[in-house]
Curated annotation (Swiss-Prot):
<feature type="binding site">
    <location>
        <begin position="29"/>
        <end position="32"/>
    </location>
    <ligand>
        <name>ATP</name>
    </ligand>
</feature>
<dbReference type="GO" id="GO:0016853">
    <property type="term" value="F:isomerase activity"/>
</dbReference>
<dbReference type="InterPro" id="IPR027409">
    <property type="entry name" value="GroEL-like_apical_dom_sf"/>
</dbReference>
<dbReference type="GO" id="GO:0051082">
    <property type="term" value="F:unfolded protein binding"/>
</dbReference>
<dbReference type="GO" id="GO:0005737">
    <property type="term" value="C:cytoplasm"/>
</dbReference>
<dbReference type="InterPro" id="IPR001844">
    <property type="entry name" value="Cpn60/GroEL"/>
</dbReference>
<dbReference type="GO" id="GO:0005524">
    <property type="term" value="F:ATP binding"/>
</dbReference>
<feature type="binding site">
    <location>
        <begin position="86"/>
        <end position="90"/>
    </location>
    <ligand>
        <name>ATP</name>
    </ligand>
</feature>
<feature type="binding site">
    <location>
        <position position="413"/>
    </location>
    <ligand>
        <name>ATP</name>
    </ligand>
</feature>
<protein>
    <recommendedName>
        <fullName>Chaperonin GroEL</fullName>
        <ecNumber>5.6.1.7</ecNumber>
    </recommendedName>
</protein>
<feature type="binding site">
    <location>
        <position position="494"/>
    </location>
    <ligand>
        <name>ATP</name>
    </ligand>
</feature>
<keyword id="KW-0067">ATP-binding</keyword>
<keyword id="KW-0413">Isomerase</keyword>
<dbReference type="Pfam" id="PF00118">
    <property type="entry name" value="Cpn60_TCP1"/>
</dbReference>
<dbReference type="InterPro" id="IPR018370">
    <property type="entry name" value="Chaperonin_Cpn60_CS"/>
</dbReference>
<dbReference type="InterPro" id="IPR002423">
    <property type="entry name" value="Cpn60/GroEL/TCP-1"/>
</dbReference>
<comment type="function">
    <text>Together with its co-chaperonin GroES, plays an essential role in assisting protein folding. The GroEL-GroES system forms a nano-cage that allows encapsulation of the non-native substrate proteins and provides a physical environment optimized to promote and accelerate protein folding.</text>
</comment>
Length: 541
């Protein structure tokens, strides 16, 4: 495929044009008075959103050179979203400001490599200042405020705070679309896994089609049970004690399943069998989790244990078990606390070592089931368009809250960047030449988020920036009420992690783009013309 190449200022101008087209679209959403953007979809209704990364991902430009610039800024939003889960619009606005300011200096003859060095020093200085301003999140109220600022909705903030309080830091909160118009929070206590009863005959409540076992014994094995003789010794002990039994096995089939069902229906004993959750090595680990949670053992030939030798003291115990068609919940397992804590520590260590996103997600789920719990927020709305938009806001709020718990909070509304810029201004005085200009690019860019928040509120950004800069750390501008307040006291908070990540990622992409000297793009080739069809059939009358 043929290539088109542009050099120097022409190349950078084309990239800058693409950057501006994408950033100008995204930045209209910043702040409490930011607007929404409507995205056309190839199928279904258009999507209305104010989520920076969703808007950025949807933008493709016709001009190949401009599109490359847009894709680079898209990288800023995506990277910030991956690291912090929020702050994508802020990162885009910062990157645009750095690129625009940097381009002016390159045109004036600055050396891009030395500029980059100055930008890096100034960013490190600002990040240090942000860390110094950060305050630990204390209590449910602050969590609710962080979530409310991110989602732009106090009700959402309260719901996320409730969910965080219920499941703790190790818990998992999932967001789903509701079948109703109401947004609801469901908490699943205990360990839940997505396997239900093997046979509907095992249900104890035929109306709800579920089986509830109080204080059952739990047989955990990775084997397939097809011969009743294998589990007969332990079944006899269960019958004599009059206890209930939950069997978790790879499968229960044939004669064994028939015998269990017949005896259940006769009332000989109360038993429910479910298939083991997960697959392969993950299944072995999940069975071990269940065993530790319930104080039982995994009956496995790998461990030298046979089903026929199983005794009641090898079985797990729980306060109650609820089994439905497609999931099982074990509540209040009777495992030793120190064993559960050791298992939690082991999973946390694995979480830190793994690089796979999929593995991280699965380990986090296991951790939640053992230590925290699982909360499900079901987002409801009148229309599908509104529901999708609400779901994106809810996800942002949740990510912002997690980031806040991790690294603390700083004053919101772009004010943290203005206060950090005071430290950067001191650094600028110690630098010289193009390195100084590079630091000044960051100094100017730090004003951009607050400037655009004010602009979207119909106010003059420069005046507000100067007023905030002159005030003490923590003071900022509440664009919704149009007044200067202590942002921490007013509950206008940003997670320090989001603030830091947005700046670092913006600098990374902007400084790389400014060092570009040539750009190579594919030349679009026209599709070959269709061969002409025969006009007629020669020789025919």
């Amino acid at each position: 495929m043929a290539k088109e190449i542009k050099y120097g200022i022409e190349a950078r101008k084309a990239l800058e044009e693409g950057v501006n087209k994408l950033a100008n679209t995204v930045r209209v959403t910043i702040g409490p008075k930011g607007r929404n953007v409507v995205l056309d979809k190839s199928y279904g209704a258009p999507l209305i959103t104010n989520d920076g990364v969703t808007i950025a991902k949807d933008i493709e430009l016709e001009d190949a050179f401009e599109n490359m610039g847009a894709q680079l800024v898209k990288e800023v939003a995506a990277k910030t979203n991956d690291v912090a889960g929020d702050g994508t619009t802020t990162a885009t606005v910062l990157a645009q400001a750095m690129i625009n300011e940097g381009m002016k200096n390159l045109a004036a003859g600055a050396n891009p490599i030395v500029l980059r060095k100055g930008m890096k020093k100034a960013t490190d200085c600002a990040v240090e200042a942000i860390a110094g301003m950060s305050e630990k999140v204390t209590g449910k109220d602050q969590i609710a405020k962080v979530a409310a600022i991110s989602a732009g909705d106090e009700e959402v903030g309260q719901m996320v705070a409730d969910a965080m309080e219920k499941v703790s830091n190790d818990g998992v909160i999932t967001i789903e679309e509701s079948k109703t118009m109401k947004t609801e929070l469901d908490l699943v206590e205990g360990m839940q896994f997505d396997r239900g009863y093997i046979s509907a005959y095992m249900a104890t409540d035929m109306d709800k089609m579920e089986a509830v076992l109080d204080n059952p014994y739990i047989l955990i094995t990775d084997k397939k049970i097809s011969n009743i003789q294998e589990i007969l010794p332990v079944l006899e002990q269960i019958v004599q004690s009059g206890a209930k039994l939950l069997i978790i096995a790879e499968d229960v089939e044939g004669e064994a399943l028939t015998t269990l069902i017949v005896n259940k229906l006769r009332g000989t004993f109360n038993v429910v069998a479910v298939k083991a959750p997960g697959y392969g090595d993950r299944r072995k680990e999940m069975l071990k989790d269940i065993a530790i949670l319930t104080g039982g053992q995994v009956i496995s030939e790998e461990l030298g244990l046979e089903l026929k030798d199983t005794t009641m003291d090898m079985l797990g115990r729980a306060k109650s078990v609820k089994v439905q068609k497609e999931n099982t919940v074990i509540v209040d397992g009777e495992g030793a606390k120190e064993d559960i804590d050791a298992r939690v520590a082991q999973i946390k260590a694995q979480l830190e070592e793994t690089t796979s996103e999929f593995d991280k997600e699965k380990l986090q789920e296991r951790l939640a089931k053992l230590a925290g719990g699982v909360a499900v927020i079901r987002v409801g709305a009148a229309t599908e368009t509104e529901m999708k938009e609400a779901k994106l806001r809810m996800e942002d709020a949740l990510n912002a809250t997690r980031a806040a718990v991790e690294e603390g909070v700083v004053s919101g509304g772009g004010s943290a960047y203005i206060h950090a810029s005071k430290k950067v201004a001191e650094l600028v005085k110690t630098l010289s030449g193009d390195e100084k200009i590079g630091a000044q690019i960051i100094l100017k860019a730090l004003e951009a988020p607050l400037f655009h928040i004010a602009y979207n509120a119909g106010l003059e950004g420069a005046v507000i920036i100067n007023k905030v800069r002159e005030s003490e750390v923590g003071t900022g501008f509440d664009a919704y009420k149009e007044e200067y307040v202590n942002m921490i006291d007013a509950g206008i908070l940003d997670p320090a992690k989001v603030t830091r990540s947005a700046l670092q990622n913006a600098t990374s992409v902007a400084s790389t783009l400014l060092t570009t000297e040539s750009v190579v793009a594919n030349i679009k080739e026209d599709a070959p013309a269709m061969p002409a069809g025969g006009a007629g059939m020669g020789g025919m009358m």
